[in-house]
Amino acid sequence: DTVTALTGGSLKFEIMPAGAVVGVKETLDAVDKGLIDCGFAWTHYWSGDHPAAMLFGSPVAGGGVGIDNIAFLSWFQYGGGKELYDRLWKEMGRDIKGFMIQPVGPEALGWFPKPIKDMADFRKYKFRTPPGIPGQTYKDIGIASVAMGGGDILPALEAGTIDAAEWCCPKPDLTFGFQKVLKHYYLQGLHQVVVNADFYITGKTYNAMSDHEKKSLEVAANASLAKSLSYRIYENGKALRELTEVHGVKLEDTPSDYFTEYMAAAKKSLETNAAKNAFFAEVWDSMKAFADIAVPFWSGAQCLMRS
């Protein structure tokens, strides 16, 4: 609606449900080939095509440098991230114009059947994790990490195929129904501190647009970033209250040894990928240079204001 209004109706979108034309994991291919003009997905889905996609969609452990979703957007808008993001598609050999539109993080560590006091407790459970580097990092610290699609998680928990799981954050987790099978919820995690969803448009379609239409897409995308962050903070807060006060979910603190073990493994994984891929290294170096300047202020200025 925003784009249609900004362009006076010259650009209109027909919104189709996921899977109507192709599966979610085929979205980028479909846009690239012009099967559909545009699509919506999470850029870390394409980490198998290029490891640097993870750094834009969901940089593990905040890129190993203390970046949260707000700091990530600062890097993206003003620290050189957007220019590197635009190059990603060429690195992947795709005829794509991408727009980052929906920050989602931070995601919760997850749901457990019993409290976990330390990593020894954590290692007792078969744990659903995201695919790719975040999930592999769990395996690197001895967690029985199991990747599976969202629709398979609750049946797997009920069948005992897995014991514990992560999905997203309070609002989506409540809607999903985790509280029906597990009651111990841990918010603080490192696997997906930053998560971003994107809008993709095929290059041929984008290049045929007027300058006004292109600028309208940019303005709408930037507005969406702010609206998404604002929406999720409040909605997740309401959902967390419902989980604890209505559904009897117990909010737990993540064991301290989790952070040291996961961060060390994440940094090792990032270093390995940087050694193997020059563009990955360039993007990560940019993040680290940004964090060296921004994180001391941003993390240092945070405080808990509770009466």
Could you say what each language-model-derived stretch is?
Residues 1-72, 90-307:
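N-terminal secretory/targeting leader peptides
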Residues 78-93:
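Hinge/lid segment of periplasmic solute-binding proteins
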